[in-house]
Curated annotation (Swiss-Prot):
Cofactor needs: FMN
Modified sites of kind FMN phosphoryl threonine: 186
Transmembrane domains' residue ranges: 15-35, 36-56, 66-86, 87-107, 128-148, 215-235, 239-259, 275-295, 297-317, 318-338
Any single Gene Ontology cellular-component annotation: plasma membrane
Any single biological process term in GO: transmembrane transport
Family, as annotated: Belongs to the NqrB/RnfD family.
Biological function: Part of a membrane-bound complex that couples electron transfer with translocation of ions across the membrane.
Protein name listed in UniProt: Ion-translocating oxidoreductase complex subunit D
Annotated localization: Cell inner membrane
Entries under InterPro entries matching the protein: NqrB/RnfD, RnfD_bac
Pfam families on file: NQR2_RnfD_RnfE
Membrane topology summary: Multi-pass membrane protein
Length: 355
């Protein structure tokens, strides 16, 4: 005798938590590389962000009368906190990451109704607010540890984050100024300054050639390579789709190489741009957010290309050296329109004008 049961009759182990866990795992190599080049600060920031995220998720669950496990089990809050922690300078004051996580989870996620309801990428909302509100703290990137006379120890890292000075009394800006020829900004600032202020062809060529080497010496090339490898793993495991990162990187690369070709004097800038800043981070781990990105196959290509175009415009012609966060948020606004006009044709219907 057969037993009648209700649908669904097929089940999948691809739960939300599994997807989030894969994404977190794919970010860990970049986390380790960032620690290798920039010190213990990244681990402290990540621990602080994740701990606060857990507290916020529990508090929201209590306020809404839900079981605590209901909000913690999907790991979305932890992923948001980790993304934000890896996006800010490792030795930013503790209150920077605290404000960022609160804004990302409370205002950008739970105010809209929680996971799946938010219109904008929560981590990028938090990051953009921090960048606009606290530009000094958000641009205080230490040079790689190998370039520092006295790299911060674990005790120094805690002291810098919670007391703004090392155990010997040096601030982040003093550590930055102690290294000749190295500024607190990334290689993107150097590219922008070189293109805008140097007119001599020989000098410009030499400086822009040096930028590509700075990407590797400064650690940004290795960090982006780690994000690239992690992103390729996610595509292989079908955790994310290939359309968004390929369209984003392809559009940006095409425009960057075209700019280099037209300028005639710019060499290596496109390569340096692709492997510096948050380019690979944004392409594989931020723009691919399944809630705030386009959901149709054609829409993913359009969305990714739009993000790549906006990053190009901001980096080459805007005031900010990176621009990934603002590009993703601006593209999020266009998602409903993109999805509306890229819906695939229903099986059995004819191509024609949309009614």
């Amino acid at each position: 005798m057969f037993k009648m049961i209700s649908s669904p009759h097929t089940h999948s182990n691809n739960l939300t938590a599994n997807f989030m866990l894969w994404v977190i795992g794919a970010m860990l190599p970049a986390l380790v590389v960032q620690w290798y080049f920039f010190g213990y600060g990244i681990f402290i920031q990540a621990s602080l962000a994740i701990g606060l995220a857990v507290v916020i998720e529990i508090a929201v669950a209590k306020l809404r009368g839900k079981a605590t496990a209901f909000y913690l089990a999907d790991l979305s809050g932890i992923l948001t906190a980790l993304i934000l922690a890896m996006a800010i300078p490792p030795y930013a004051p503790y209150w920077v990451i605290v404000i960022g996580v609160i804004v990302a989870l409370l205002l950008a996620k739970h105010v809209y109704g929680g996971l799946g309801q938010n219109l904008f990428n929560p981590a990028m909302i938090g990051y953009a607010l921090l960048l606009v509100s606290f530009p000094v703290q958000m641009t205080a990137w230490l040079p790689p540890l190998a370039l520092l006379n006295e790299p911060p120890t674990l005790a120094d890292s805690f002291s810098l984050i919670f007391a703004n000075v090392t155990t010997d009394g040096f601030s982040v800006h003093q550590l930055i100024q102690s290294v000749d020829g190295v500024s607190s900004a990334t290689v993107l600032d150097g590219s922008k300054q070189a293109m805008s202020s140097i007119k001599d062809n020989v000098t410009l060529g030499i400086q822009l050639d040096k930028l590509f080497a700075d990407v590797l010496v400064g650690g940004w090339g290795q960090v982006n390579l780690a994000f690239l490898l992690g992103g390729l793993l996610l595509i292989y495991k079908r955790i994310i789709h290939w359309q968004i990162p390929v369209a984003m990187l392809g559009t940006f690369a095409l425009l960057s190489f075209a700019t280099d070709f037209v300028s005639e004097t710019a060499r290596w800038t496109a390569q340096a741009q692709l492997f510096s800043g948050a380019m690979m981070f944004g392409a594989f781990f931020i723009a691919t957010d399944p809630v705030t990105a386009s959901i149709t196959p054609k829409g993913k290509l359009i969305f990714g290309a739009l993000v790549g175009l906006l990053v190009y415009l901001i980096r080459y012609y805007g005031n900010y050296p990176d621009g990934v966060a603002f590009a993703v948020l601006l593209a999020n606004i266009c998602v409903p329109l993109i999805d509306h006009y890229t819906q695939p044709r229903l099986y059995g219907t004819k191509l024609g004008r949309r009614q």
